[in-house]
């Protein structure tokens, strides 16, 4: 059984008969964290993998605990945020880009993951709003409070309920990561306090809005400690 995230069909489950045999033409196609072209046929229930070609393998992530944990977390986020066969091209593009960047070690994994989490929320209908107060809609240059119920910043005049107080530097970091392409987030330098607040905001929202809480978050906490 394979879990495949596709460009046009969303996430699907497929059968690869005989793929465990080393001489099978499907053997290399079924390795974890492979990006490629796959020929699938729809059976009575599941898809069946017929053949394919690997474009890029992220196998180096399998031998590095930190890389593997972050890559597994990305996969889990896709799994919990999308229904089967729910197309989401923007999220697919961000997912592949993030795997590439993790593999190259060009950007801090933690920074990269926070940016991906914000884009995941955006492309699944839970995007945070930073430019206007979520209550009165007045323009915001910065805020020290995020509403976790209404997904955005709150101005000084509106009630601070169902949310978190954060540093203004954290607010600006959230806005930057939300609006910046993944390959450009390296420009941001953060204090440990801001990193902790970013994690608190995104992890709370992700655990609240999707069908289940990502289990990989516990391993991420362990790595941070």
Swiss-Prot record:
Superkingdom per UniProt: Bacteria
SUPFAM superfamilies: ArfGap/RecO-like zinc finger (SSF57863), Nucleic acid-binding proteins (SSF50249)
Organism in which the protein naturally occurs: Clostridium perfringens (strain SM101 / Type A)
Protein name per UniProt: DNA repair protein RecO
InterPro entries per UniProt: ARFGAP/RecO, DNA_rep/recomb_RecO_N, NA-bd_OB-fold, RecO, RecO_C
NCBIfam families recorded: reco
Function comment: Involved in DNA repair and RecF pathway recombination.
Family membership noted in the UniProt record: Belongs to the RecO family.
UniProt entry tagged with the keyword Cytoplasm: no
GO cellular component: bacterial nucleoid
GO biological process, one term: DNA recombination
Keyword DNA damage carried by entry: yes
Keywords: DNA damage, DNA recombination, DNA repair
């Amino acid at each position: 059984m394979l879990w495949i995230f596709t460009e046009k069909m969303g996430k699907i489950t497929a059968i690869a008969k005989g793929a465990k045999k080393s001489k099978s033409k499907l053997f290399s196609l079924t390795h974890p964290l492979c990006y490629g072209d796959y020929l699938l046929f729809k059976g009575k229930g599941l898809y069946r993998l017929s053949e394919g070609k690997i474009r890029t393998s992220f196998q180096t992530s399998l031998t590095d605990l930190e890389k593997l944990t972050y890559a597994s977390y990305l996969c889990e986020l896709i799994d919990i945020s999308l229904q089967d066969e729910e197309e989401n091209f923007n999220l697919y593009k961000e997912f592949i880009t993030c795997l590439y960047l993790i593999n190259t070690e060009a950007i801090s994994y933690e920074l990269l993951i926070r940016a991906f989490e914000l884009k995941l929320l955006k492309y699944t209908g839970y995007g945070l709003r930073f430019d206007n107060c979520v209550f009165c809609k007045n323009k915001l240059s910065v805020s020290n409070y995020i509403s976790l119920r209404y997904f955005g910043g709150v101005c000084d005049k509106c009630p601070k309920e169902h949310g978190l107080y954060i540093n203004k530097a954290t607010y600006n970091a959230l806005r930057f990561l939300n609006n910046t392409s993944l390959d450009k987030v390296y420009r941001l330098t953060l204090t440990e306090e801001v990193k902790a607040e970013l994690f608190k905001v995104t992890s709370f929202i992700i655990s609240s809005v999707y069908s289940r809480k990502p289990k990989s978050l516990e391993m991420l906490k362990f790595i941070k400690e």
